Amino acid sequence: MFKVIKQEGRARRGGFTCPHGTVQTPVFMNVGTQGAIKGALSARDLKEIGCQIELSNTYHLHVRPGDELIKSLGGLHRFMTWDGPIL
């Protein structure tokens, strides 16, 4: 659920809670096109720089490596070694 924390004019600051964590908005989302962030950053590195959420392109993951492989490895969070929210 999204909750507005502060509003000034048409701008607003808020947050939403998901099963894997809370995300404060506005937010910058790192893009893991095929389940990985370019630049060889680890999940720990991402947490250290304040990454709250990762964006993952499900179409690219469906094409390669494929849904069944991701499922057999324990799902997208385990495949990406990311315990936070994923969009």
Regions found by a protein language model. Name each.
Residues 1-87:
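Non-catalytic, usually N-terminal nucleic-acid engagement modules in DNA/RNA processing proteins
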